Amino acid sequence: MNNSTIVKTLLWPDELATAGFAQQLAASLVHQQTGLNACITLDGELGAGKTTFVRHLLHALGVTGRVKSPTYAVVEPYEVLAGHIWHFDFYRFTDPQEWEDAGFRDIFASVGLKLCEWPVNAVGMLPIPDITFHISVDNVDQRHVAL
């Protein structure tokens, strides 16, 4: 866990609760003064539910169809009525030069929602996040979330 201040803790007892929170967050993001413009990081071990939460959030924001995990591509872009969204998965990110070569600096400088899994692998390159989710597994279905 990083040194950010925890302002809220949540318990997602099942995937339905995860989806419900994603819908609440989506509504809040769309209605903020700056529009759909934020950097959200998601920390947690493998299988903690980061991608599942992002899928629910993307669907709540209007993405239709299948939401792919960007583990191998590193980033998947989406366009919704509210604006641009980029879903990053830095799990396999090892080469800082890739940051420049792939145009990530330009993406993070542009307006839109950036959702970043495994931010620890891009430390020093990512901007300070607007929201950080620390997701941990309590049991098979239940997740403990600190923001």
Regions of interest found by a model, annotated:
Residues 50:
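Conserved lysine of the Walker
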Residues 2-27:
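N-terminal pre-Walker A segment at the start of P-loop NTPase domains
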Residues 43-45:
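P-loop (Walker A) phosphate-binding loop of NTP-binding proteins
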Residues 1-8, 59, 94-147:
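Short phosphate-coordinating micro-motif centered on Lys-Gly-acidic
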Residues 63-78:
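Short beta-strand-centered segment that lines the nucleotide-binding/catalytic pocket of NTP-utilizing
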Residues 28-37:
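Phosphate-binding P-loop
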